[in-house]
Amino acid sequence: MVVQAPIQLPFRILGETADLIAIDKPPSLLIHPSKPGGPVTLWDRLRELLAYEIASGGQVSLINRLDRETSGIVLVAKNAQAARHCSMAMARGEIAKEYLALTVGWPKSEEWSVREPILRLGEVEDSRIWLKRGVHPMGVPAHTDFRVMKRIMHPKVGPISLVHCIPHTGRTHQIRVHLTHSGYPVVGDKIYGPSEGCYLEFIETGWSAALAEKLWLPRHALHSCSLRVALDKVQHSWNSALPDDLLRFLIGSPEGC
């Protein structure tokens, strides 16, 4: 009898039901393959993990997606019925998602909301980064609520904040765009941080000491920390704590006011 080695998962499983599985995605793990022969992705390992469900006719579907550098909760449906239910719930705004972000600066208010439309900037102006978004009156409606959880004086960066973010719509880069629009960009953000040149430099050279001086972190400090959805009248919820790389960044940083 051939005994197969256990699958080495590059992520943690937060919880699983007959219909759903919640994944805690680490930073820098791609969701989908970007090119043939590229690095292992979350989708690759999911298909291995759920091989039995797939072989039995199951339809594995990602309910939400995270940018490569964003860490945290990714919800996966294990069959077509659950995928359809969750997709409809998402469209109705009935899947509650929450994030934690480390931002540059101390916001003037403890809580604030941003209701500003977002579009891809290349649609209305010259942009060196095709995927870059921005606030623009011709964009689609977007709404995010923010609350300051902690103000910190970081020894390298200066004033930074731990901000709780609740997106009520699901636009690409929404939280990052709305935080930058508010004047408090996400720490480590190559596109919406100090200069979009950081992103272009990273594409050209990879992570470097020069970029570390400008960005402080090799990835943007955004983490999906909570997700809730009801399925068949049962409320499901999952939580994910701030990951180690962001916690290490905060070590030795005295709390501010």
Language-model segments: residues:
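RNA pseudouridine synthases
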Residues: 1-257
